């Protein structure tokens, strides 16, 4: 698995996963599951969310009470909204779960104005690892050597940032990050993936780029990027100023999370089985090795902690809605 090079396979790690406690509520392990479970991926095969499910799903099977399969189902349409809507409408029996991009789904729902699903009503199973924070970088050949240089450029003219389309979390990170840091942005948008818009900055098509730290580190280690600032509270990149040093603690709230959910109304005992299996899979030797090989941080979350996190994410991104919907 160490051959993957996508940004979703790299998360700065090193923390031990916490021990989770899930309520039993008198559940009989023999009752569920009795057949295969479909795992909805609202994106095309080969992307980061797809990779996560296809790696962790088979490991998760080992920790279910009965021997059944977890079957990935890609539903790539509407920027992810069709797959999420299908999951939302599925029968709440535990045989349909899905991976959701947060805040991507918040942003998409705000832009599309769809009422096909209510993200606050999903039955949450947990998360696939710790969320990715962001960093500001410039191409290695850029004359800018520090964050102060970037600010100085912004005082003269808007800074050109290469980004994805408005539906992407990188777009949101760039809009919110520049507002918090007082940088005047000029967005060059429409790049389809993280590699595309980062390479644009490396080529010099833009002045700078705000990308997830895993992606940033991959290019920085290759000598192609120079990191100027981290959005983490405490920078994982030596010598790089962080949110605390920049005086903007809210930067650490800009992240992309991989939530695992089920339809509204999932019975608590069934939710417990799925949540326990997911949490144990993240601590399985196979996943631990994969995470270590790819600088990943896999932190299990119980359903209540997951629901709390999604509420916090919603509140944060609602605060910045005007920048995300109108651009």
Predicted regions and their residues:
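N-terminal (or domain-start) structured segment
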Residues: 27-121, 170, 180-208, 219, ...
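N-terminal secretory signal peptides and thylakoid transit peptides that target proteins
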Residues: 1-16
